[in-house]
Structure formats: C-alpha cells, structure tokens
Amino acid sequence: MEAAIEFDEIVKKLLNIYINDICTMGEKRLLNNYEKSILDRIYKSCEYIKKNYELDFNSMYNQININDITTSDIKSKIIESLLIDSRPSVKLATLSFISLIAEKWGEKNRTKIMEILSNEIVEKISNNGKDFIDFIDRDDDDIVDDYVLITNYLKITIFGAILGITAYYICKYLLKSIF
C-alpha cells in the first residue's frame, strides 16, 4: 500500500512539472526570433556563470540557509547591490544567482522565489535593456573577464549583506535579552 502511495506522489510531482513546462513552452512560442535568440543567450550566459562559479554561488547559498535569511532580506540586498552597480554584467550575475536559488528551492518554494524575483528586481535588471542585450551578445571570450570581476563583486556584496543581516538579528536578540 505504501509503495502505491509513493508512486502516486511521484506521478503527481511529474505531472505538475510537465504542465509547468507546457505552459512555459506556450509562452516561448509567442516570442519572435529576436526575442528567442536573446532568451537563449540569457540561458547560456547564466549557465556559464553558474557552472564556472558554482563553488562561490553554493557558498553564498549555504550562507543564506545557515543564517535563515528571509526572502525580503535577500530581495532588499539584491536591489541595494543593483542600485550601487547597474552594469549589465552585475545584472546577469545577479540573475544567475537567483536562478541557482530557484533550482535549489524547486517547485515547492515557487512563491518564495517569485518574492525574490519581484517586479522591482525585474525592473532594475531590465532597465537600460539595450546595454543588457549588447552585453549578452558579445563574444564569450570578452565576457569571461567581466564575469570574474562581477562574481567577486557579487560575492562580496552578498557576504556583506549576510553579515549585516546576521549582525542585525544578533543585536536585536541582545537588545531583547537586555531589556
């Protein structure tokens, strides 16, 4: 009986993934060729960043989990970093990190992921869209050097954010215990 329930859950999970994929494919069919090529470059660029900086991103992700940082804290730090530096390479590195979070959180946490990738962040990333498109259309060799610099910047920003948020919660806890 238990085995049948496990199979039911597996099929249920797979059907949900299938339907989500079909919906996404339907949205992709509505794109023109130019939009499809840009989307393809975004995919490739983000995958390149995630693959080459997997250890750094995983370390940043683990810090988020260890410190139990809320989605609103993550979102506010991402917005803050995009306000400080709005270069297309920073935007792409940020998007790559968000996509890594989405992969790790999976379907169960879709609403949490969408809280992070709010309209405000989408607006910040898509602002100056021509520069963003020009950046992802460059040759891969030109982009590599920018990714190294940007990933280091993003790593410092996220770790700084984590330290700041952790310090905030520690101070809050200490003040509560004192008073």
UniProtKB/Swiss-Prot annotation:
<feature type="transmembrane region" description="Helical">
    <location>
        <begin position="148"/>
        <end position="170"/>
    </location>
</feature>
<keyword id="KW-1081">Inhibition of host apoptosis by viral BCL2-like protein</keyword>
<dbReference type="InterPro" id="IPR021119">
    <property type="entry name" value="Poxvirus_F1/C10"/>
</dbReference>
<dbReference type="InterPro" id="IPR036834">
    <property type="entry name" value="Bcl-2-like_sf"/>
</dbReference>
<keyword id="KW-1043">Host membrane</keyword>
<dbReference type="GO" id="GO:0033644">
    <property type="term" value="C:host cell membrane"/>
</dbReference>
<dbReference type="GO" id="GO:0033668">
    <property type="term" value="P:symbiont-mediated suppression of host apoptosis"/>
</dbReference>
<keyword id="KW-1045">Host mitochondrion</keyword>
<dbReference type="GO" id="GO:0042981">
    <property type="term" value="P:regulation of apoptotic process"/>
</dbReference>
<dbReference type="GO" id="GO:0016020">
    <property type="term" value="C:membrane"/>
</dbReference>
<dbReference type="Pfam" id="PF11099">
    <property type="entry name" value="M11L"/>
</dbReference>
<keyword id="KW-0812">Transmembrane</keyword>
<keyword id="KW-0472">Membrane</keyword>
<protein>
    <recommendedName>
        <fullName>Apoptosis regulator DPV022</fullName>
    </recommendedName>
</protein>
<keyword id="KW-1133">Transmembrane helix</keyword>
<comment type="function">
    <text>Plays a role in the inhibition of host apoptosis by sequestering and inactivating several proapoptotic BCL-2 proteins, including BAK1 and BAX. Prevents the conformational activation of both of them.</text>
</comment>
<keyword id="KW-1119">Modulation of host cell apoptosis by virus</keyword>
<comment type="subunit">
    <text>Interacts with host BAX and BAK1.</text>
</comment>
<dbReference type="GO" id="GO:0033650">
    <property type="term" value="C:host cell mitochondrion"/>
</dbReference>
<keyword id="KW-0945">Host-virus interaction</keyword>
